[in-house]
Amino acid sequence: MKLFKELEETKEQVIKMAKLVQEAIDKATEALNKQNVELAEEVIKGDDTIDLLEVDIERRCIRMIALYQPEAGDLRMIMGIYKIVSDLERMGDEAENIAERAILLAEEPPLKPYVNINFMSEIVKEMVNDSVISFIQQDTLLAKKVIEKDDTVDELYHQLERELMTYVLEDPRNIKRAMHLSFVARHYERIADHAENVAEAAIYLSEGEIVKHQHIKEKGE
């Protein structure tokens, strides 16, 4: 019973961490759109909270293994949590990177409307949320949907890269802002990759199937 209680509390901490990551992505995107330096700095400072949560959750996992010597499903869940909090922490770092770029981009007028970037932001926030839920609830179907969304993010990233190249070719003075936007898009793309890792961990936890670096398709397709 003690293991069950501690494991449930640890799961709640993972969900809390995921929500903080989503908030960081949301605020970083808003800071970018509104050229709000103060909000961007808030994201940067808030990353410390995400880092501390990672350390706390990792310690909880080590404690549960040492104290209760869990087996089978409980052990897989604990080891899975230990792994995915690293991905969540990296997502927080990427949100911080977006905020740092937002500060640099606030120095000049926007190069273009951030339509694709905003779309990427919404998708990756959904991926973060759904990947963690799929892991906690061992929902393989939801995990596979998360993995499929990564292709959409990749396509948006490449589409934006082509568009930014056009801006640079039209006027070389655009290169600085285009470079910053390219990095911003790359940071979103990396968040999606980490969410995909979490979803893959969910599938392994539920089915025992290693799906890393594979394209997931529904059975029968």
From Swiss-Prot:
What do we know about how this protein assembles, alone or with others? Homodimer.
An example Gene Ontology biological process: phosphate ion transport
* Any one annotated GO CC term: cytoplasm
**Any idea which UniProt keywords this protein has?**
Cytoplasm, Phosphate transport, Transport
Instruction: Give this protein's Gene Ontology molecular function annotations.
Output: protein homodimerization activity
Q: Which domain of life is it from?
A: Bacteria
Gene this protein is translated from: phoU
Name of the featured protein: Phosphate-specific transport system accessory protein PhoU homolog
Subcellular localization is given as: Cytoplasm
Q: What does the sequence similarity comment in the record state about its family?
A: Belongs to the PhoU family.
Q: Tell me which InterPro entries the record gives.
A: P_transport_PhoU (IPR028366), PhoU-like_sf (IPR038078), PhoU_dom (IPR026022)
**Main role?**
Plays a role in the regulation of phosphate uptake. In this role, it may bind, possibly as a chaperone, to PhoR, PhoB or a PhoR-PhoB complex to promote dephosphorylation of phospho-PhoB, or inhibit formation of the PhoR-PhoB transitory complex.
- Mostly located where? cytoplasm
What organism is the protein native to?
Aquifex aeolicus (strain VF5)
